[in-house]
UniProtKB/Swiss-Prot annotation:
It comes from Thermococcus sibiricus (strain DSM 12597 / MM 739). One of its GO terms (molecular function) is ATP binding. This is FAD synthase. Its cofactor is a divalent metal cation. Keywords: ATP-binding, FAD, Flavoprotein, FMN, Nucleotide-binding, Nucleotidyltransferase, Transferase. Pfam families: CTP_transf_like. Homodimer. Catalyzes the transfer of the AMP portion of ATP to flavin mononucleotide (FMN) to produce flavin adenine dinucleotide (FAD) coenzyme. The lineage of its organism: Archaea, Methanobacteriati, Methanobacteriota, Thermococci, Thermococcales. ATP binds at residues 14-15, 19-22, 100.
Length: 148
């Protein structure tokens, strides 16, 4: 009897101040396959892309994600880039993009093809809409509540 190949889903993000929007996204990503691997953005990447340091370090964010039952593995990304080398090593069947991740899906698919990464790219729609399901909104609310 042959063993059925497990479907590996890979996603990535900052995941700073984990909130309900992250949880809904990760649950949906996990439902796409058997294993969910999360690439946590390197602190330097967060600074470059968001214009601020993350509240929690990449190690703290990774530890929190590892504690979630839907997450099977966590990898910390390379500084200042999206590492296709890490993605290639993880050998995903599916790459799950969050609804607010500003990737050009066509360009991403083309880049994956160039790197010989044969993964389907799926953008997960918002499952939970709320003003507090966004890290920047949570930070803003904290500042307004405790710093004014």
């Amino acid at each position: 009897m042959t063993k059925k190949k497990k479907i590996r889903v890979v996603t990535g993000g900052v995941f700073d101040i984990l909130h309900v929007g992250h949880i809904h996204f990760l649950k949906q990503a996990k439902e796409l396959g058997d294993e969910l691997v999360v690439i946590v953005a390197h602190d330097k990447t967060v600074e470059e892309r968001k214009g601020r340091r993350p509240i929690n370090s990449m190690y703290e964010r990774a530890e929190v994600l590892k504690a979630l039952k839907m997450v099977d593995e966590v990898v910390i990304g390379e500084p200042n880039c999206i590492s296709f080398e890490i993605v290639k090593q993880l050998n995903p069947d599916i790459i799950a993009l969050g609804p607010d991740q500003n990737f050009d899906v066509s360009a991403l698919k083309e880049e994956l093809k160039k790197k010989n990464i044969n993964a389907e790219v799926i953008r997960i729609p918002y499952a939970y809409k709320s003003d507090v399901a966004k890290t920047s909104k949570i930070i803003q609310k904290i500042v307004e509540t405790f710093c004014e």
